[in-house]
């Protein structure tokens, strides 16, 4: 059985997706439900996800899919979940006019948005463009995507502001891996991953930034760094 706030949030998400085709942000949810902080929204979203009413989609910090509705909200039989656009496509977009075809030794990957190498930000968003990546960076049939780096917290690992990182999609990591981590369900960051018992440490590669140590249920791995592209 859902609480009143859970029903209100589900109703708000459904209405916004029906109107705009995309779910509301955590800030918009907070204002709509008159809550003081986004942590309250995070708890409500997690509860709805655990009960099977919504599902969070990978690589999009705001990506929510309505799986089912309670009887009090259902419009009748035949309800179909509405998925927001902008998830990773099966095929790259057509080449723009005047562009040259990429050689067989490279493949085009979608650039899914920006990732913070600094203070975590609500970062991963819709596909902005595609980028040619050498096939030697990629691992077999695994799914990959790219992100633009913003910030300088990983400079001692050779990752600079403005670089494009190539990420292999995976939901687990080994200590020492540089990963895309989603913190509290809405903040995305690029950091070195360390497990310490039931805690996760997200380490910067810049002494100006502190290591963040969080409970494991607050951190969701979105992928592992496998390559980097830099423009001069």
From Swiss-Prot:
GO biological process: DNA repair; DNA replication; proteolysis; SOS response
Known EC number: 3.4.21.88
CDD domains: S24_LexA-like
Keyword Transcription regulation: yes
A Pfam family recorded for this sequence: Peptidase_S24
Family: Belongs to the peptidase S24 family.
Quaternary structure and interacting proteins, as annotated: Homodimer.
Job description of the protein: Represses a number of genes involved in the response to DNA damage (SOS response), including recA and lexA. In the presence of single-stranded DNA, RecA interacts with LexA causing an autocatalytic cleavage which disrupts the DNA-binding part of LexA, leading to derepression of the SOS regulon and eventually DNA repair.
Name of the protein in its database record: LexA repressor
């Amino acid at each position: 059985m859902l609480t009143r706030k859970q029903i209100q949030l589900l109703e708000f998400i459904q209405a916004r997706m029906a109107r705009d085709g995309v779910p509301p942000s955590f800030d918009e949810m907070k204002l709509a439900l008159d809550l003081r902080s986004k942590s309250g929204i995070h708890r409500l979203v997690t509860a709805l996800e655990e009960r099977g009413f919504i599902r969070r989609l990978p690589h999009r910090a705001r990506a929510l899919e309505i799986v089912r509705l309670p009887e009090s909200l259902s419009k009748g039989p035949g309800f179909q979940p509405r998925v927001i656009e902008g998830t990773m496509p099966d095929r790259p977009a057509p080449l723009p006019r005047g562009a040259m075809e990429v050689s067989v030794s490279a493949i085009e990957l979608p650039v899914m948005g920006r990732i913070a190498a600094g203070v975590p930000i609500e970062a991963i968003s819709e596909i902005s463009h595609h980028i040619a990546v050498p096939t030697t960076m990629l691992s077999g049939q695994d799914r990959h995507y790219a992100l633009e780096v913003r910030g300088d917290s990983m400079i001692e690992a050779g990752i600079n502001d403005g670089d494009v990182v190539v990420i292999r999609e995976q939901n687990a990591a080994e200590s020492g891996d540089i990963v895309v981590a989603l913190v509290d369900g809405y903040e995305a960051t690029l950091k070195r991953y360390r497990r310490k018992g039931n805690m996760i440490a997200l380490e910067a590669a810049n002494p100006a930034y502190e290591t963040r140590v969080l409970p494991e249920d607050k951190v969701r791995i979105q992928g592992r760094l496998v390559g980097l592209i830099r423009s001069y």
